[in-house]
Amino acid sequence: MSDTTELVDLAVIFPDLEIELKYACADNITGKAIYQQARCLLHKDAITALAKSISIAQLSGLQLVIYDAYRPQQAQAMLWQACPDPQYVVDVTVGSNHSRGTAIDLTLRDEHGNILDMGAGFDEMHERSHAYHPSVPPAAQRNRLLLNAIMTGGGFVGISSEWWHFELPQAASYPLLADQFSCFISPGTQHVS
């Protein structure tokens, strides 16, 4: 069942926030754009936590760079088709916390304009992407710890398999939302309603 909870547009609430939606371009695990519109939306409860995280990052001379937030269920089906591994992608029949508007994917940019090295790229579905992995160089691990501190300081929690993913505590208790914008349909992708 899908809810119609109204989501908040991050570009409107935080006009200075850097938003680089990876699923609105080909720089993701599918190798193609999934979103027809580059809209970055979150549940109002996640907006409150994000505002705190933005302030904490600024205190450190850092900037958040948003890669994904709310994700239509149709997009989740396409990601599952590209990577049907429940360690990294939630099966659309289960329901991703992104599709509830309660999860966000992001990284950090320093005061010189450089994206911090996290030791593995966004959507790199490999053990190196796990929050704490021995193959990650110490400097990159410190950057992950910094991102984690900023996000948990705002009220989010991380997950063990992706350094870039944070969500509200109890995120799964929020309802799955009706798709808020369109996706490009891949052959073989099941329609989700």
From Swiss-Prot:
Pfam families on file: Peptidase_M15 (PF01427)
Active-site feature positions: 162 (proton donor/acceptor)
UniProt enzyme class: hydrolase
InterPro entries from the UniProt entry: A_A_dipeptidase, Hedgehog_sig/DD-Pept_Zn-bd_sf
Cysteines engaged in disulfide bonds, as pairs: none
Binding site for Zn(2+): 98, 105, 165
EC number: 3.4.13.22
Site positions per UniProt: Transition state stabilizer: 71
Transmembrane feature ranges: none
Reactions mediated catalytically: D-alanyl-D-alanine + H2O = 2 D-alanine
Note on cofactor: Binds 1 zinc ion per subunit.
Subcellular location field: Cytoplasm
Function: Catalyzes hydrolysis of the D-alanyl-D-alanine dipeptide. May have a role in cell-wall turnover.
HAMAP family: A_A_dipeptidase (MF_01924)
Family to which the UniProt record says this protein belongs: Belongs to the peptidase M15D family.
Name of this protein: D-alanyl-D-alanine dipeptidase
Species, as recorded: Escherichia coli (strain K12)
The gene coding this protein: ddpX
